[in-house]
Every structure is written in C-alpha cells, then in structure tokens.
Amino acid sequence: MDQSEHVVDLFHRHIESCMYTMEALGEGIAKASEGIVESMLSENKVICCGEGTQGLIAQHLVTNLLNHYQHERPALPAMALSTDSATATAIAAQSGYNDIFANQIRALGH
C-alpha cells in the first residue's frame, strides 16, 4: 500500500468510526444537548468537569459556551471545574480524590 492509499484508508476508517459513534451515541448526545438548553433557558449554568484529557474537552466546551463559537452571540453561563489545580489538590488532600468535583458541584451548582 502506497502513502496515498494509506491516507485514503485512514479517511475511510474515520468515516466508519463516525458512523458507528453516531449510531451508538446520537440519541444520548441529543438528550444531553436538550438538557443543556433547558438548563440555560431556566437561567441555570452548565458545569463541566473531567480528568486528564477529558478535562481538556470539558474546558473546550466551556470556552465555546463563554465565547462565541461559530456565530456572534452573548456569552452563555458555563464553568469548568477541572481547570483549578490548586482547589483540586486541596480537596484531594483533605477529603479524598473522589470528592474533587463533588465538593465543587455542591458549592457552586445551584
């Protein structure tokens, strides 16, 4: 297989992966999106969290909500809990690793 065929094969596998993901997760993603919209229409905020690379994805979503994404619009109320390493370290040291996000959500998620 030459380089060109390899690149085409990579694209085909990516398309197959996207189709599988759409079929497996499409309904859940739609429901989550509806919940986010409903929350914001009720004047609530979106709180995102994650560890490792999932924390980066959470932060990316929050950035898109706070800043216009594809169209100019007002900022939407959102915050990422995984960006504050000092708070995460303090909570983990005193309460345990499992409480890092739970403590913050209890305090900020109203």
Segments from the language model and where they lie:
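Conserved N-terminal alpha-helical segment that immediately precedes and caps sugar-phosphate-binding
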Residues: 1-110
